UniProtKB/Swiss-Prot annotation:
Heme 1 (or BL or b562) is low-potential and absorbs at about 562 nm, and heme 2 (or BH or b566) is high-potential and absorbs at about 566 nm. Its main location: mitochondrion. It comes from the Eukaryota. This is Cytochrome b. GO terms for biological process: mitochondrial electron transport, ubiquinol to cytochrome c. It comes from Perameles nasuta (Long-nosed bandicoot). It is a multi-pass membrane protein.
Length: 381
């Protein structure tokens, strides 16, 4: 009798995706982040669901309802801390996952990569609308500043902003619709994740060497299920340590004060995971130019596959490209730091140089390094 998991229509899909999936025998811990992201998404949806049971999306009671969750709901403090810090873990895993894709040339699976970039944008949008919900000072002013950027769009900008706000300022209508968006977007993300996996399983996984792994494949279970379980254990340990012992450092102190439209905080800034894009936005003194640069900072990932010039897929054996990659990582850390600083010298010029370098490395230096490495390895053909 054939095993049920190989014949049952539903079990067969799960079997082909997570059990009998042929996987390269040499993929390293950098390939763990896909499963970690899946778990992060499940944690966020579950904790979010329990928070939504007690949260009220009204300007008068939103802040109080979050305080009520932390004080009066059984383990409400833990659910809230897991949700807030879970978002940070989600983005840490996301950035490492994208970085892995760039380093090992996974972006040459174009469909998988493109849906991944759209996923990144959608998750950032979800995090933004979620950050508005506690209705603290930084929630309110963050929402005001970021939505106001759309007014830079010629002709329709102002109308568009007021349409998103549901009035002439960020108010009750804005909070209600942002709560609706924040509830629905994770399910859209889940659907996109399934498409992402669908495209990945069409080609199979890449591997550190960048060579065709078809000659040497092993079943996903038990080899990579146990490997993923170790990564999962470490991530959940980190998340629990954050949520239970140190839940606040990744947030903003201003968000402990209720939203006040009459009092602007001295430094308006988003959460840490958006700071690099915010720094690029601020480095351009023109409003529309800044908005376009902000979009380009993420969308530039879409052109990476088109700019691949090297005859080797992975950077594993390409030291010049490796150097540029780590320069890009350092540059992104620099941009993240600058995004949290006030708009004054020397931070302005540092941000502008770092922004130019970010685009220069991706669009010009990496493709040139690929050509140079081809020449040095006598791979012109």
């Amino acid at each position: 009798m054939t095993n049920l998991r190989k014949t049952h229509p539903l079990m067969k899909i799960i079997n082909d995706a997570f059990i009998d999936l042929p996987a390269p025998s040499n993929i390293s811990a950098w390939w763990n982040f896909g499963s970690l992201l899946g778990v992060c998404l499940v944690i966020q949806i579950l904790t979010g669901l329990f928070l939504a049971m007690h949260y009220t999306s009204d300007t008068l009671t939103a802040f109080s309802s979050v305080a009520h969750i932390c004080r009066d709901v059984n383990y409400g403090w833990l659910i809230r801390n897991l949700h807030a810090n879970g978002a940070s873990m989600f983005f840490m895993c996301l950035f490492l996952h994208v970085g892995r894709g760039i380093y090992y040339g996974s972006y040459l699976f174009k469909e998988t990569w493109n849906i991944g970039v759209i996923l990144l944008l959608t998750v950032m949008a979800t995090a933004f609308v979620g950050y508005v919900l506690p209705w603290g000072q930084m929630s309110f002013w963050g929402a005001t500043v970021i939505t106001n950027l759309l007014s830079a769009i010629p002709y329709i900008g102002t109308t568009l902003v007021e349409w998103i706000w549901g009035g002439f300022s960020v108010d009750k209508a804005t909070l209600t619709r942002f709560f609706a968006f924040h509830f629905i977007l994770p399910f859209i993300v889940t659907a996109m994740v399934i498409v992402h996996l669908l495209f990945l399983h069409e080609t199979g996984s890449n591997n550190p060497s960048g060579l065709n792994p078809d000659a040497d494949k092993i079943p996903f279970h038990p080899y990579y299920t146990i490997k993923d379980a170790l990564g999962l254990l470490l991530m959940i340990l980190m998340l629990l340590l954050l949520a239970m012992f140190s839940p606040d450092p990744l947030g903003d102190p201003d968000n402990f004060s209720p939203a006040n439209p009459l009092n602007t905080p001295p430094h308006i800034k988003p959460e840490w995971y958006s700071l690099f894009a915010y720094a690029i936005l601020r480095s351009i003194p023109n409003k529309l130019g800044g908005v376009l640069a902000l979009l380009a900072s993420i969308l530039v990932l879409l052109v990476i596959p088109l700019l691949h010039t090297a005859n080797q897929r992975s950077m594993m054996f390409r030291p010049i490209s490796q150097t540029l990659f780590w320069l890009l990582v350092a540059d992104l850390i620099m941009l993240t730091w600058i995004g949290g600083q006030p708009v004054e010298q020397p931070f302005i010029i540092i941000g502008q140089v770092a922004s130019i370098l970010y685009f220069l490395i991706i669009i010009a230096l990496m493709p040139l390094a690929g050509l140079l490495e081809n020449y040095m390895l006598k791979w012109e053909s």
